[in-house]
């Protein structure tokens, strides 16, 4: 049965092109063979199921069978599509032996030419094309009236197969020759044909977007089996045709209505009304949309072909590559210096910072995502944060990663809101329903989200990505929409220190405006400090000049970017398992990190938690993937621990110069006068023993510089002793406090075994006195208790000795680290 004969009671001109295409396509289905048997017999038999109604046909098979038919389908697709569907229905009915006709549809795959969203113009309306894009918005599924059956209210004639033009369309006129009804019709819902309908919006990917242009978007219409097959954030290839649909949002908008009453007031002139808007009518506007017949999820091009996003094995990937590409991957996997060659090929224009490059490289491979027996997901993606001074190539790292990674989103923290990073709930223009629009983290699903100026984000916006960074999901509960969406993305963030420069005397958390929960979710922290180094500065300047003078020759790569991308994509499919030896080493290394965190040098790091152990596991798995290994070995754990250790203690606390605190205790006027009186005697001694004094001063100056760790050890030792003495005095009922001289004497007794000469004893005594002065006047850890009553001038000299040796107590608010 032909489509042209389906209209009963209405004279229509036969469509010769459509009828011929229908017969040729039915012959193709019945005759095309592959491996000696008819290819589409089994797929047609599966359409017997009530859930199936679409037959997928490879367009390459049509081209092999009849080039003229393929050309007609390409050029006249929308015109002959009903005839092609009718041929599928006839073919299915003949093969299966159905008693009743079943409405079937055809979907073409493997259309050779892919077009960009920006290339969709009116010249492509009605042709079969394939476009690619990223889904940014999905609408709910609702029924669509495709073909209506109407009843004339005047003569009761049934009018069948009234095609709906993407809006409710009444018959133009009653098909009864003796009836001239044009308005009064009623829809017969029971006999009309409804299909599932879903509308989605896609936009250009960042790789296809010309510089300085706004991403173009187009609406995709999905029907029948294609609904609910796409997810916001994923990239797909859509095969179908570009169509023109009425702009229903304009029709449903607020406008002027036709007035039934008189349009003029009594006494006014009877002037005519001009213009359709004055009559209460609206202009019918049209817009372009894409009617899809097949959808395929894809990632970036791999080995010259498109690689599906579903789980694939090494054998599947091998089939997608040529022999030369496979041999190159095998050769790279055997490279003894692969680790270094990959980072030199990935960042050829950035000098130095090899540790940062290694961390970002391991982020490309990622760990292994796991699911526990309680259905709890453990993320495998690695999050990296780069903190550093201006002009240390932070943004350059992010830009190169966003250009290299097949699925990467680059955004700025200050210009991004919480909804822009996660997901937004917006109102549909046509149905006025609330729909979810994907944010940056959803668009970077199974990829990397590069966030620059991470520290400039508002606090509430940082809180919004807590869940996405650890659970890798985004939960939304607003405007009546409750949903949990996937955000399986790695985050590469760049942040600046608070005052523009990294302060070595402060801890990492004190240098950046990030909360502790956010910091603990990063696996690696890299601190870049702009130090003045003549050798490094010369090398960086030479590199920059070479890049500006001769860009191509100055870039040295061991492998091309395509080879690195192909190798990373291939290695990511490995799922390495932790060996027993590697597990023991992971536990030992985590114990070392925790012990060091509780030590005195822990101020320079952030808090070590169980998340750092999981970070070490992910980094170890990434190292195993880099070597295409199915097992995590001890050497992988060793490198992961080294990298994590490097990122945690990248910047140490500076040495403490006790000589800088000289004079802090000289603010007392009496003390100053006494020193002035004794200057003459001191000068005479210096004149007689000039050489000895200078030598002794040099020795003392060396001793008065302590490392931060030694300084913390000594200060903690004194504080604990003084608090023990304070507690003892309080129990005995004596005055609280301990004399300064007693503290010095106690310390010298503790280190008596280490003192071998009188000079060393004097040096130790001067050192501990300087240390006590710093704790009093600089750190304000110790409080000196001095007499506050006024005394006669005569008693000043007598009481000076007592004031020079005051009682010392520990500040009550001081907490020992």
Swiss-Prot record:
One term of GO molecular function: ATP binding
Keyword ATP-binding: yes
Main location: nucleus
Listed EC numbers: 3.6.4.12
ZnF (C4-type) ranges: 152-179
UniProt binding sites for ATP: 391-395, 496
GO annotation (BP), single: DNA replication
InterPro entries, alphabetized: MCM, MCM6, Mcm6_C, MCM_CS, MCM_dom, MCM_lid, MCM_N, MCM_OB
Pfam families: MCM (PF00493), MCM6_C (PF18263), MCM_lid (PF17855), MCM_N (PF14551), MCM_OB (PF17207)
Domain of life: Eukaryota
Domain MCM: 338-544
Recorded catalytic activity of this chain's protein: ATP + H2O = ADP + phosphate + H(+)
Effect of residue 676 to K: In allele K1214; eggs exhibit thin shell and flimsy dorsal appendages
Quaternary structure annotation from Swiss-Prot or TrEMBL: Component of the Mcm2-7 complex. The complex forms a toroidal hexameric ring with the proposed subunit order Mcm2-Mcm6-Mcm4-Mcm7-Mcm3-Mcm5. The heterodimers of Mcm4/Mcm6 and Mcm3/Mcm5 interact with Mcm2 and Mcm7.
Known function: Acts as a component of the Mcm2-7 complex (Mcm complex) which is the putative replicative helicase essential for 'once per cell cycle' DNA replication initiation and elongation in eukaryotic cells. Core component of CDC45-MCM-GINS (CMG) helicase, the molecular machine that unwinds template DNA during replication, and around which the replisome is built.
Record protein name field: DNA replication licensing factor Mcm6
């Amino acid at each position: 049965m032909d489509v042209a004969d389906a209209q009963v009671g209405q004279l229509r001109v036969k469509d010769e092109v459509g009828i011929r295409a229908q017969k040729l396509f039915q012959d193709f289905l019945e005759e095309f063979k592959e491996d000696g048997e008819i290819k589409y017999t089994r797929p047609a038999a599966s359409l017997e199921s009530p859930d199936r109604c679409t037959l997928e046909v490879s367009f390459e098979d049509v081209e092999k069978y009849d080039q003229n038919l393929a050309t007609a389908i390409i050029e006249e697709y929308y015109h002959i599509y009903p005839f092609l569907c009718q041929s599928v229905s006839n073919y299915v009915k003949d093969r299966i032996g159905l008693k009743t006709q079943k409405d079937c549809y055809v979907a073409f795959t493997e259309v050779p030419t892919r077009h960009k969203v920006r290339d969709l113009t009116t010249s492509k309306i009605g042709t079969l094309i394939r476009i690619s894009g990223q889904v940014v918005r999905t609408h709910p599924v609702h029924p669509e009236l495709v073909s209506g059956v109407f009843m004339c209210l005047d003569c009761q004639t049934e009018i069948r197969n009234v095609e709906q033009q993407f809006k409710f369309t009444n018959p133009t006129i009653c098909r009864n020759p003796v009836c001239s009804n044009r308005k009064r019709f009623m829809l017969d819902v029971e006999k009309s044909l409804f299909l599932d309908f879903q509308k989605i919006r896609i936009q250009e990917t960042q790789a296809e977007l010309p510089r300085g242009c706004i991403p173009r978007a187009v609406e995709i219409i999905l029907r029948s089996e294609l609904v609910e097959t796409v997810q916001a954030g994923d990239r797909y290839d859509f095969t179908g045709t570009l169509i023109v649909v009425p702009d229903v949002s304009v029709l449903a908008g607020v406008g002027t209505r036709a007035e039934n009453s008189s349009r003029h007031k009594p006494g006014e002139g009877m002037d005519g009304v001009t213009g359709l808007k004055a009559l209460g009518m609206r202009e019918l506007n049209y817009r372009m949309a894409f009617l899809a017949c097949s959808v395929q999820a894809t990632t970036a091009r791999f080995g010259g072909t498109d690689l599906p996003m579903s789980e694939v094995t090494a054998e599947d990937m091998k089939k997608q590559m040529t022999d030369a590409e496979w041999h190159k991957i095998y050769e790279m996997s055997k490279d003894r210096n692969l680790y270094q060659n990959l980072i030199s090929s990935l960042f050829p224009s950035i000098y130095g910072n090899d540790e940062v490059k290694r961390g970002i490289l391991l982020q490309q491979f990622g760990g292994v995502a796991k699911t526990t027996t309680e259905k709890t997901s453990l993320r495998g993606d690695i999050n990296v944060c780069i903190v550093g001074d201006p002009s240390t190539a932070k943004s350059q790292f992010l830009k190169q990663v966003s250009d290299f990674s097949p699925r990467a989103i680059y955004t700025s923290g200050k210009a991004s809101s919480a909804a822009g990073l996660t997901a937004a709930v917006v109102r549909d223009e046509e149905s006025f329903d609330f729909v979810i629009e994907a944010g940056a983290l959803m668009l970077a699903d199974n990829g990397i989200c590069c966030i620059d100026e991470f520290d400039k984000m508002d606090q509430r916006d940082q809180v919004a990505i807590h869940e996405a960074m650890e659970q890798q999901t985004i939960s939304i509960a607003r405007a009546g929409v409750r949903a949990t969406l996937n955000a399986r993305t790695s985050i590469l963030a760049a942040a600046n220190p608070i005052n523009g420069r990294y302060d070595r005397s402060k801890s990492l958390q004190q240098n950046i405006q990030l909360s502790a929960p956010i910091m603990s979710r990063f696996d690696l922290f890299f601190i870049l400090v702009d130090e003045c180094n003549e050798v490094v500065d010369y090398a960086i300047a030479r590199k920059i000049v070479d890049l500006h003078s001769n860009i191509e020759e100055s870039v040295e790569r061991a492998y091309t970017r395509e080879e690195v991308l192909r190798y990373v994509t291939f290695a990511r499919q490995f799922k390495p398992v932790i060996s027993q030896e590697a597990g023991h080493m992971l536990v030992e290394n985590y114990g070392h990190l925790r012990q060091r965190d509780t030590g005195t040098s822990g101020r320079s790091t952030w808090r070590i938690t169980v998340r750092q152990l999981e970070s070490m596991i992910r980094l170890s798995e990434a190292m195993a993937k880099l070597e295409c290994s199915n097992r995590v070995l001890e050497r992988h754990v060793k490198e992961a621990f080294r990298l994590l250790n490097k990122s945690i203690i990248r910047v140490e606390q500076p040495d403490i110069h006790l000589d800088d605190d000289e004079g802090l205790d000289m603010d007392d006027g009496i003390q100053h006068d006494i020193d002035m009186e004794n200057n003459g005697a001191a000068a005479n001694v210096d004149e007689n023993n000039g050489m000895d004094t200078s030598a002794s001063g040099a020795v003392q100056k060396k001793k008065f510089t302590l490392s931060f760790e030694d300084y913390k050890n000594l200060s903690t030792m004194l504080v604990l002793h003084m608090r023990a003495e304070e507690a003892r005095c309080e129990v005995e009922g004596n005055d609280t406090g301990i004399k300064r001289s007693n503290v010095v004497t106690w310390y010298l007794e503790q280190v008596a075994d280490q003192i071998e000469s009188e000079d060393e004893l004097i040096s130790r005594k001067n050192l501990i006195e300087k240390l006590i002065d710093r704790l009093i006047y600089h750190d304000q850890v110790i409080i000196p208790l001095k007499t506050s009553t006024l005394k006669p001038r005569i008693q000043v000299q007598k009481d000076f000795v007592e004031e020079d040796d005051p009682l010392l107590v520990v500040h009550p608010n001081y907490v020992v680290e």
